[in-house]
């Protein structure tokens, strides 16, 4: 049974998302109530998925409780009730992944790989692309940074999120000034790549966020890819902010890698993805040495796994 099938079953088992009783007037809570995590009864909206924190109340200095309004989605989204229910179903047969031959382990390993296949489809990856599970977007970008060929020069705008700005080898990184406009960004990028092509050799990688976590501005990914291709540069798309709002299609966009986090897509914290071309990842030293990263270990040598297992540990 696939995760998708389980999710559908869970959704059917959930109560209908209909209107709930209108919230009552603000009242003064007891001292014991303030010590606990308060909850509220609010009005639900038709067609809007429920989150685990939608009835959260916030105690005020005036000893009242007000509804919690989440304006922090760019940092982390609340988990969906359907996600919570699906996790609960999966936990009933949870066991080790690819580390056992027992019944529960085989079920969990199957779901794990089914989830990988679904992510592969979700991001529109090429057939030969790898999908590697990580902790979050920052972890994904650091994994790629550790996997770059030694001669790689990285190009990154100074306006990038710290995860995309700081992961790379400083001595091999070209920082592009904050652009004044979209057109300015394209001009600055091409100028940086042109100068590098005239003075250096080796691989090149352009790092770009699909959407700004500060302004919400959408970047012209296809135009950036077009410029990068002229200088034989690869492109990694930091889609942490883009994935929750726009369809991600690696093949259609022409990017080489994409990184994003589950906790910005209504899942709990602790899951991320790096998807993209396999060659650099298969040639690199394992990101996490041990566990499934080792295909064979003898006194004389260690043979590292290929594919996603090489870096998932």
What residue spans do the PLM features occupy?
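Pyridoxal 5′-phosphate
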Residues: 2-23, 27-313
């Amino acid at each position: 049974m696939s995760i998708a099938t389980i999710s559908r079953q869970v959704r059917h088992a959930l109560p209908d998302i209909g209107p709930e009783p209108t919230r009552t007037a603000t009242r003064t809570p007891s001292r014991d109530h303030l010590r606990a995590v308060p909850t509220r009864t609010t009005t639900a909206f038709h067609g809007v998925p429920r989150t685990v924190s939608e009835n959260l109340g916030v105690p005020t200095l005036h000893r009242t409780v007000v509804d919690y309004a989440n304006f922090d989605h760019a940092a982390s989204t609340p988990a969906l009730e359907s996600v919570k229910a699906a996790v609960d179903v999966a936990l009933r047969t949870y066991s080790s992944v690819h580390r056992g031959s027992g019944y529960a382990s085989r079920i969990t390993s199957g779901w794990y790989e089914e989830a990988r296949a679904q992510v592969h489809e979700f991001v529109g990856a090429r057939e030969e692309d790898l999908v590697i599970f990580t902790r979050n977007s920052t972890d994904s970008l650091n994994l790629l940074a550790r996997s770059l060929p030694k001669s790689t020069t990285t190009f990154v705008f100074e306006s990038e999120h710290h995860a995309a700005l700081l992961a790379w080898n400083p001595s091999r990184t070209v920082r592009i000034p904050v652009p004044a406009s979209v057109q300015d960004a394209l001009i600055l990028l091409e100028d940086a790549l042109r100068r590098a092509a005239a003075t250096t050799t080796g691989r090149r990688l352009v790092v770009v966020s699909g959407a700004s976590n500060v302004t919400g501005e959408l970047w012209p990914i296809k135009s950036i890819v077009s410029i990068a291709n002229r200088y034989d540069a690869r492109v990694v798309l930091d889609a942490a902010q883009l994935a929750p709002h726009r369809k991600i299609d690696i093949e259609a966009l022409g990017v080489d890698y994409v990184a994003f986090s589950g906790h910005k897509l209504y899942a709990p914290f602790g899951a991320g993805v790096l998807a993209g071309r396999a060659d650099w990842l298969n040639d690199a030293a394992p990101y996490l040495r041990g566990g499934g990263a080792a295909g064979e270990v003898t006194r004389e040598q260690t043979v590292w796994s290929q594919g996603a297992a090489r870096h998932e540990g």
